[in-house]
């Protein structure tokens, strides 16, 4: 992590102000190289640079190198990144999708990755970098840590939870069967999904989307791996069975309302989420036979 921060500074900041006297730096001096990065479309990089530069200047204030922090006034100067919308299939196309998935003849590990993505609807990095020691097979639980040990040479492999706190994912019996199958393949390794040619690395970030393309889908307009989260969110909401808090907790979404966020955080909704992920798996299974809406499937179970 430290080397990555230094690399960003060397690339984008030092060429502009690296030789400057820190006591002479103004907000505009700090902001100029960061805005240049922002204007190039690298909004996330620009946001991280702003955070790092602000932290460095804060350290300088705390250690009496400068009297005040000129970086504090950079707030609000960068583009706000719009939420990205990922393509996802409507529930009416679930039977078609599940039939294509059943007919998929690629690697078994890849098929399992697609199915687990669909059943758990976690983020791509949360699944790709998963370790076997995160799973409790007796309780059918997956504990995704806030941060993982970095895999040398694998970009972003330190990623655990996006919200920087442990996330407990209850697992359906269908997901547990897949994990048992996967254990026959990679159970002797640390990672669930080791790389093709090097078991110390992980499967490519494009694996799930490549499988979807092999199944005949356009991952830019029809469905992509991240779109499974949208598909699950839509069906769970349409069923009318589950509270928004439980759904949002399962998706590990952040809550902008601080009071509500504190409530959701302290209340894991684990019992409801256990029932919910099992309902989702059963609903998908039902759609392998014929299409039924989430609402109608929910009514049959009440």
Short names for language-model regions:
Residues 72-79, 129-184, 255-258:
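Conserved tyrosine-mediated DNA breakage-rejoining catalytic core shared by Y-recombinases
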Residues 80, 88, 144-152, 176, ...:
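Catalytic-site neighborhood detector that most strongly recognizes the C-terminal catalytic loop/helix
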């Amino acid at each position: 992590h430290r080397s990555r921060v230094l690399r960003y500074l060397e690339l984008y900041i030092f060429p502009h102000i690296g030789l400057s006297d820190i006591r002479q730096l103004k907000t505009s001096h700090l902001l100029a190289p960061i805005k240049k990065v922002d204007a190039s479309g690298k909004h996330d990089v620009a946001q991280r640079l702003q955070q790092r530069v602000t932290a460095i200047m804060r350290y300088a204030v705390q250690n009496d190198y400068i009297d005040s922090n000129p970086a504090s006034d950079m707030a609000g100067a960068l583009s706000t990144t719009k939420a990205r919308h990922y393509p996802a299939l409507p529930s009416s196309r679930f039977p078609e999708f599940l039939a294509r998935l059943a007919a998929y003849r690629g690697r078994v590990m890849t098929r399992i990755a697609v199915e687990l993505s669909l059943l758990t609807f976690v983020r791509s990095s949360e699944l790709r970098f998963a370790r076997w020691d995160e799973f409790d097979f007796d309780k059918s639980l997956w504990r995704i840590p806030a941060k993982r040990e970095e895999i040398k040479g694998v970009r972003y492999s330190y990623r655990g939870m996006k919200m920087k706190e442990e996330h407990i994912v209850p697992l359906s019996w269908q997901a547990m069967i897949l994990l048992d199958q996967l254990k026959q393949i990679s159970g002797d390794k640390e990672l669930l999904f080791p790389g093709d040619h090097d078991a110390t690395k992980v499967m490519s970030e494009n694996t799930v989307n490549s499988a979807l393309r092999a199944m005949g889908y356009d991952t830019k307009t029809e469905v992509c791996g991240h779109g499974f989260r949208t598909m699950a969110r839509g069906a769970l909401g349409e069923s009318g069975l589950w509270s928004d808090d439980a759904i949002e907790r399962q998706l590990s979404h952040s809550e902008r309302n601080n009071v509500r966020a504190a409530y959701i955080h302290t209340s894991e909704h684990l019992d409801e989420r256990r029932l919910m992920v099992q309902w989702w798996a059963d609903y998908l299974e039902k759609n392998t036979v014929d299409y039924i809406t989430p609402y109608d499937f929910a009514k049959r179970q009440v």
